[in-house]
């Protein structure tokens, strides 16, 4: 019972919340990005919030974010949600379609994008999906950037203004990126 009191893991549909010594830590990111069962832990709503947060943190002021995906059925829904979130912050979403994870990292750097997002759950079974985020150099984002993204999501974008009119971003399908 004492162990249970000292460490309790609570689970809700969108994130893991760890309680330790009175502090609640909201955590979306795992060891290698964000993963979960589609429409349970990893929802369309959360995916859109991730797109908004990534654009706000890594691509402010009309940046460019490359988005790739694997062939899972849920990847299309997640891609649309992330792209919508990115555009709502004034950045452009460049959809490169089905591509291996290292391809997104490479294209992000080569095309001088502000960030790259890969939708894939790698070796996990089909009901899972995941989101991996790369910085402008094609590297996995740091723990500090992960915390900034999580903080924005859990604050429900408090004190964040969103563009309107011709300042919103656009979605571009760039299938030709695979030949680079």
Describe the function of each predicted region:
Residues 22-84, 88-89, 167-180:
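An N-terminal, well-structured beta->alpha segment
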Residues 131-180:
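Gly/Ser/Thr-enriched, mixed-charge loops and adjacent short helices
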Residues 31, 36-40, 44, 101, ...:
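Generic structural "secondary-structure junction" signal
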């Amino acid at each position: 019972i004492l162990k249970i009191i000292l460490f309790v893991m609570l689970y809700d549909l969108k994130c893991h919340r760890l309680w330790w010594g009175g502090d609640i830590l909201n955590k979306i990111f795992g060891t290698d990005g964000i993963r979960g069962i589609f429409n349970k832990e990893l929802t369309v709503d959360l995916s859109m919030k991730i797109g908004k947060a990534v654009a706000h943190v890594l691509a402010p002021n009309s940046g460019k974010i490359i988005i790739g995906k694997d062939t899972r059925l849920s990847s299309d829904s997640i891609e649309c949600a992330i792209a919508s979130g990115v555009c709502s912050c004034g950045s452009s979403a460049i959809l490169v379609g089905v591509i291996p994870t290292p391809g997104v990292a490479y294209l992000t750097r080569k095309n001088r994008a502000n960030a790259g997002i890969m939708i894939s759950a790698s070796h996990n079974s089909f009901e899972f999906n995941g989101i991996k985020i790369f910085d402008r150099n094609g590297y996995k984002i740091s723990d500090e950037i992960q915390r900034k993204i999580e903080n924005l999501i859990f604050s429900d974008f408090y004190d964040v203004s969103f563009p309107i009119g011709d300042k919103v971003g656009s979605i571009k399908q760039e299938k030709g990126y695979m030949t680079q």
